[in-house]
From Swiss-Prot:
Transmembrane segments: none annotated. Keywords: Ribonucleoprotein, Ribosomal protein. Belongs to the bacterial ribosomal protein bL28 family. It comes from the Bacteria. One of its GO terms (cellular component) is cytosolic large ribosomal subunit. The keyword Cell wall biogenesis/degradation does not apply. GO terms for biological process: translation. This is Large ribosomal subunit protein bL28. GO terms for molecular function: structural constituent of ribosome. Gene3D superfamilies: Ribosomal protein L28/L24. Residues 1-24 are annotated as: Disordered. InterPro entries: Ribosomal_bL28, Ribosomal_bL28/bL31-like_sf, Ribosomal_bL28_bact-type, Ribosomal_bL28_sf.
Length: 78
């Protein structure tokens, strides 16, 4: 399972760890992903989405029905 938010599209970013001596070593910054079940009232069922914390905020603000409609329109199977 890839580490990508289904709502925002956030994915791991690449950067550097920096030591006290300012040495750089490669690292990945992972998105804050959670598998979360959302109740969809119109379908009378739960839908599981892998979303970041920002994705959950978007769903809270706009509503799960609207976000699901956009996901399905873009070709995501939900």
């Amino acid at each position: 399972m890839s580490r990508v938010c289904q709502v925002t599209g956030k994915r791991p970013a690449v950067g550097n760890n920096r030591s006290h001596a300012n040495n750089a070593t490669k690292r990945r910054f992972l998105p804050n992903l959670h598998t979360h079940r959302f109740w969809v009232e119109s379908e009378k069922r739960f839908v599981s989405l892998r979303v970041s914390a920002k994705g959950m905020r978007i769903i809270d603000k706009r509503g799960v029905e609207v976000v699901l409609a956009e996901l399905r329109a873009s070709g995501v199977k939900v």
